[in-house]
Amino acid sequence: MATNVINKYSYDRNSVKAGILHFGVGNFHRAHLEYMTSHLLEDPTQRSWGICGAMILPGDERLYKALKEQNGEYTLTVCGRDGKNEVYRLGALVELYWGIEQKEAILDKIADPDIRIITLTITEGGYNISRQTGEFMLDNAQVAHDLANPVNPLTAFGYVAEGLRRRKASGAGPITILSCDNLQHNGNTARRAFMSFVEAQDQELAAWMEENVTFPNSMVDRITPATRPEDVERLNKENGTDDKAPVYCEDFIQWVVEDNFAAGRPAWETVGAQMTDDVTAFENMKLSLLNASHTLLSYPSFLYGYRKVDAAMHDERIAKFVRQFMDIDITPYVPAPKDTDLELYKQTLCERFGNRTVSDQVARLCFDGASKFPVYVMPNLEKMIGDDKELIRVAYLFAAYRHYLKYHTDDNGEQFEVADPWLTVDDHKLIDSDEPLDFLALSPFRSTDLRAAHNFTQPYLRMVESIKSKGAMKTLEEIL
């Protein structure tokens, strides 16, 4: 029996015109940008900002057909931290094309003067930027295909380049390319990727883009789990629906957008977005508090035997540890962005981590630590070392990370596989070493010489020995 009431949009979708073309119609996009835009369309003055979805991958077929059958509509279940859900039927997706069958329609849509913003959720890897060089990889097979076959593209870069070529030829005017992916400086990354592609293919178009296309940075935040078949069944049962493509997410949402649009924009600030001149302060807050805290709780929680984040955060010891890290270690280095209550932000983070309905896997937070430490942990640790701060909590994190990588066994004797793909052969030699200080020379930590920082090495060595002899949780109890 249905237990949730569905909040349905009240506007006439026939009165809505697509002004946004979106690449990557996945769950996060449908819980974030489409959620905000569907609410925005309740305002009659904003009805020229509907969304046209562009799905270009062969693997998109199932979702494309499900959404097409439902005329672009679907239900979003917003899971409250208080255990109560809000359900919405969203209608912002007014057009939808699948590139495998409708390539020309997508290309023509990019050239349509009604389309004034192209938005992207193509994932971090989708920008095709080399981790080693930071440059766009022109030798990628699909990219090479698109460079040689401009009217038969496979990638978002190829689609956008050919669509903009048509836009330039028809005089349809400027356009904004807005990344909504969860990565730092996402607009700068999008600019590097798309401009590198176009410069390699069409110098005239590249010059036109320099004058007519902007790439605003934005910061996005909303936990949106993958929807498994059992989730679809559960959501439809709870909501009394027969939705082939439902989505569920947490009740927190944040979207900070650099106000740098080439051809106008929706009034997203009226539905909760924060428009700003610079997203850097917001990114720093998120990286230093949300992402760093995720990393902090991941390895100790996993070593203690927790496999779900919400279960770990309902352990008072871990919750206290995370909050001490936020308050004592990190807050001095995080200037609050304009109109932001930092205390409320931290409290909300702890509540979000403990939300049982959208629980994350601890293993996912542990995955690829080599990529996370340089971005989330090292910048503030370097400042803390320089300021001669107490470093016991961060030292404990490093000791727990070493134990996780070296011993593959938790406090309960349960063995596990480690997934840290960017560690090098030399890194693994340092992990295997019986000298704990060798671990501090790992490539993810190379931005500073941790072994020379005695205010760090002393507590670190203590933590290494304690975790090995007493276990991760007993050690944590002693430092709280």
Model-predicted regions and their roles:
Residues 1-480:
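Substrate/ligand-engaging "lid" and interaction regions
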